[in-house]
Amino acid sequence: MVSSDFENEKQPDVVQVLTDEKNISLDDKYDYEDPKNYSTNYVDDYNPKGLRRPTPQESKSLRRVIGNIRYSTFMLCICEFAERASYYSTTGILTNYIQRRIDPDSPHGWGAPPPGSPDASAGALGKGLQAASALTNLLTFLAYVFPLIGGYLGDSTIGRWKAIQWGVFFGFVAHLFFIFASIPQAIENANAGLGLCVIAIITLSAGSGLMKPNLLPLVLDQYPEERDMVKVLPTGESIILDREKSLSRITNVFYLAINIGAFLQIATSYCERRVGFWLAFFVPMILYIIVPIFLFIVKPKLKIKPPQGQVMTNVVKILAVLFSGNFIKRLWNGTFWDHARPSHMEARGTIYYNSKKKSAITWSDQWILDIKQTFDSCKIFLYYIIFNLADSGLGSVETSLIGAMKLDGVPNDLFNNFNPLTIIILIPILEYGLYPLLNKFKIDFKPIWRICFGFVVCSFSQIAGFVLQKQVYEQSPCGYYATNCDSPAPITAWKASSLFILAAAGECWAYTTAYELAYTRSPPALKSLVYALFLVMSAFSAALSLAITPALKDPNLHWVFLAIGLAGFLCAIVMLAQFWNLDKWMENETNERERLDREEEEEANRGIHDVDHPIEAIVSIKS
């Protein structure tokens, strides 16, 4: 027993010595004259050969900083700001436009409430809550299904740049249709206005579906270095330009741009109330014009990667092999993914993808790892179907709740802005306050913990909605039929801001971590498509919301809030149990990826194989 304890005490020192010897050995083998170890994207007097890849010892010892970020990256973020500002400014007023009937005394017939009506909301078509909920959910559903097409086109056929260009075109046409739908003649003929609105919704969804999955990957493409690089400063100090931290900074700026744009929907909320819907729909189009202008200016400075058609071809072939034969048995015994590994295929005598046509196997073992990681990520994404419902996924119900409360001259759809405002405030607090504090005390706030914590916080927003809706029913002059009551309940609508604040706080943990996992566990050539797979969860949420639309009416609205809140909390518990060892799985995946990289490099050097495979996945987009 004494001997065993002694060995256990000394083992870390032995491991450390062996590790240090290994690093020294690897450093000795490092070729400082090999041009492959240098990048000439940046050259100066202190770095005459360019930036250099770090040795293993340098990777552990040198100070790490954020690398040079091109101004074109920030210009693309401005494009995202303008696109999201126009999108949210439009969608934020759709509920009032569709649900509420125009007041007979509305000035000029534009939909604004008459002067002297502090608690009245703007209205136009008067189609009711169910129609408003159905169409807003249709917009959400289509806006997050079209990215699957946009991601495929961006990765495999027309490329990301052309996909974005077509998205801009469809988006501009959509804003024109919204303006046509808001003129007095269209509002007076509610069916005509509704038809124009539906066309605009479909067109806007197509534009968003082409832009959204391709713009963020294009932004990340602008970072010049593919790996960590060593830079010598004028002081003589050598530092590492950390690719992970640099991509994290870019992504945070991008995410901040999204929410600043979303916050600007406050302008259209007041436009619809003070003037009418034509101005409320015209302002987003003006914002949208920024997008093509900035894209035209920044185009010559962009690094645009061509589409890689072979990627999707290989994915389809791999899936065909995986689901051939008795795949159910392989799923059961844990050999499902091994079946498509070229090494396993050769071992069982399969040297062609298609024996009859003698089609060659065009992928490597690492392809299987990449696709497996993508599918594993999608398992987590499935939980976001419920999360999105809690995260203002039933926006029409929340807007309707606020409309039944005392507004005191504030537009009922203004409160949606508490979501982006909370994110704008909270993200810097997390990045520069909470997370560094946790690191100081060596508390590892693991990805699965962040996601589950976000789910719990977001579920509290629906519990708050349950309490408020119950209070409205109890205090409204119309009792449990308060939605369309002419007199509001004597409860200040500002209390409803808690719904949006809590949901946004949950989003800061759950959403940003999901982006991180999506990009960490997917090959770069499939970034757009994997991002689209995450977005499509919102489409499933919208479909589920459409399914429960018949229940979205008095006197049952408070039970809807409670059910979604409890479902979100339950998802957090189940997901934590299922993915408790997620960090260990990710570490094993990283080790497996490095092993496959070494094997393929050795085989290529020996001339055994010449296989194109994806470059390494982005390590993280959020630290």
Swiss-Prot record:
<feature type="transmembrane region" description="Helical">
    <location>
        <begin position="163"/>
        <end position="183"/>
    </location>
</feature>
<dbReference type="InterPro" id="IPR036259">
    <property type="entry name" value="MFS_trans_sf"/>
</dbReference>
<comment type="function">
    <text>Uptake of small peptides.</text>
</comment>
<keyword id="KW-0813">Transport</keyword>
<dbReference type="GO" id="GO:0022857">
    <property type="term" value="F:transmembrane transporter activity"/>
</dbReference>
<feature type="region of interest" description="Disordered">
    <location>
        <begin position="31"/>
        <end position="58"/>
    </location>
</feature>
<feature type="transmembrane region" description="Helical">
    <location>
        <begin position="134"/>
        <end position="154"/>
    </location>
</feature>
<comment type="similarity">
    <text>Belongs to the major facilitator superfamily. Proton-dependent oligopeptide transporter (POT/PTR) (TC 2.A.17) family.</text>
</comment>
<protein>
    <recommendedName>
        <fullName>Peptide transporter PTR2</fullName>
    </recommendedName>
</protein>
<keyword id="KW-1133">Transmembrane helix</keyword>
<dbReference type="Pfam" id="PF00854">
    <property type="entry name" value="PTR2"/>
</dbReference>
<feature type="transmembrane region" description="Helical">
    <location>
        <begin position="418"/>
        <end position="438"/>
    </location>
</feature>
<feature type="transmembrane region" description="Helical">
    <location>
        <begin position="191"/>
        <end position="211"/>
    </location>
</feature>
<feature type="transmembrane region" description="Helical">
    <location>
        <begin position="557"/>
        <end position="577"/>
    </location>
</feature>
<feature type="transmembrane region" description="Helical">
    <location>
        <begin position="499"/>
        <end position="519"/>
    </location>
</feature>
<dbReference type="GO" id="GO:0015031">
    <property type="term" value="P:protein transport"/>
</dbReference>
<keyword id="KW-0571">Peptide transport</keyword>
<feature type="transmembrane region" description="Helical">
    <location>
        <begin position="448"/>
        <end position="468"/>
    </location>
</feature>
<dbReference type="GO" id="GO:0006857">
    <property type="term" value="P:oligopeptide transport"/>
</dbReference>
<feature type="transmembrane region" description="Helical">
    <location>
        <begin position="277"/>
        <end position="297"/>
    </location>
</feature>
<dbReference type="InterPro" id="IPR000109">
    <property type="entry name" value="POT_fam"/>
</dbReference>
<keyword id="KW-0812">Transmembrane</keyword>
<feature type="transmembrane region" description="Helical">
    <location>
        <begin position="385"/>
        <end position="405"/>
    </location>
</feature>
<dbReference type="GO" id="GO:0016020">
    <property type="term" value="C:membrane"/>
</dbReference>
<feature type="region of interest" description="Disordered">
    <location>
        <begin position="1"/>
        <end position="20"/>
    </location>
</feature>
<feature type="transmembrane region" description="Helical">
    <location>
        <begin position="529"/>
        <end position="549"/>
    </location>
</feature>
<keyword id="KW-0653">Protein transport</keyword>
<feature type="transmembrane region" description="Helical">
    <location>
        <begin position="250"/>
        <end position="270"/>
    </location>
</feature>
<dbReference type="InterPro" id="IPR018456">
    <property type="entry name" value="PTR2_symporter_CS"/>
</dbReference>
<keyword id="KW-0472">Membrane</keyword>
